[in-house]
Amino acid sequence: MNEAGHVSEETYSERIARAEPQFGDILYSREGTYFGIAAEMPRNQRVCLGQRMVLIRPNPAKINSRFLRLWLNSPILSRHIHGFRDGTVAERLNMPTIRGLPVPIFQRDDQNAIAELLGAIDDKIELNRRMNETLEAMAQAIFRDWFVDFGPTRRKIDGAPDPFEIMGGLVADPDRARQMADLFPASMGDNGLPEGWHHDRLGNLVTNVIERCVPSEMTRDRPYVPIDTITARSLVIQETRPGSEAQSSLIAFRQNDILFGAMRPYFHKVALAHFEGTTRTTVFVLRPKIASDLGFALMTINDGTTIEYATQHSSGTTIPYAVWRNSLERMLVPCPPREVRVRFGHILEPMLNRMQASASQNRTLSATHDLLLPKLMSGEIRLRDVEARLEAAQ
């Protein structure tokens, strides 16, 4: 539900003519990118279905809706439905097949317990995801106010007397707000930047590092992060693959390198690596030339202006690729004095650490969820057997 589109009231009314989704319903994708994926209808939201979706309304007297959603998303049922696909270009399930999908028979108490157990993992994953969204929004707000809109300088020009006000209310600590406000000039220069700032090339801020490697014991022991595992518009790596899957066109990255999705750059895939690993040449590995510039460099590369520049100057028509040499590296970016960049990094660092910790926990929780789900659904293990594993994941 995180990437739902929006429709007009007229379209909404047309699409709910037969049935309006309500809390407890299951929304099931029978075709396309999300083939075979089920989602629960959330509380207090108005939702209508697209043409590739099916509304399933569980009988509450017979089945727990969350349990049914878990079953529909289980590897067991996934293997089952792939034998009934009737599409050649796009995967598709017809309605008779959906109506005939098998559902395991569990006592209602067992259904509720499984739903509560695995649902708690899902809820924690979602809480971490939302927390990271909030932290990233805060980081972007500070970056854009300071380095795109030049808010502190403009507020000084407008006569703002209070450091908290000068910093746009984005620095809560009074002492830190005063120290930061003192670093921003009270006038704009002829170059359109705060007095004393200058434009510099992106290539003078970061280096595009290409450390090629081949499948080996080293790559097998490190996480593998191909471009499709990098989440769009997320500053941290949320998903990795086993190093054994790293087979060709490989490049290594280090902790605190910045991964930039070069293939189809408009997808806006930028993430900070908090571990050593391997990716492919469809990703730029950008390393700050000065370690203390990490936060400023990360947010500069993540800014929409950089993504737009990379997209407009990409090569290829069917599959565009960003070009670093003599192109993206030459993009001009505002460059404040080093002390401003360092102070910004100090503010950003705890946010990034929190985001990385949440992402790491989510990977552990997801792995635990994926391990338990088929075993619980098949009866291979019982609920009492999983308590120790869940405690370790928490």
Which stretches of residues belong to each language-model region?
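Extended, domain-scale alpha-helical bundle/helix-rich regions
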Residues: L127, D149, T153, D158-M167
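Non-catalytic DNA-recognition/assembly elements of restriction-modification systems
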Residues: G100-P104, R108-F150, P174-V214, R338-G345, ...
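Non-catalytic accessory segments of hydrolases
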Residues: G32-T33, P223, P265
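Sequence-specific dsDNA recognition surfaces
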Residues: M1-I26, L183-M188, G203-Q255, T279-R280
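Basic, amphipathic alpha-helical recognition segments used for DNA target recognition
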Residues: M1-E3, A17, F23, P42-R46, ...
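Short aromatic/hydrophobic "clamp" motif used to bind/position activated sugar donors
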Residues: Q51-M53, N256, T281-V283
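Short, Lys/Arg- and Gly-enriched loop/turn segments at beta-strand edges
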Residues: Y34-M41, F267-A273
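A generic structural signal for residues embedded in beta-strands
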Residues: Y28-S29, L259-G261
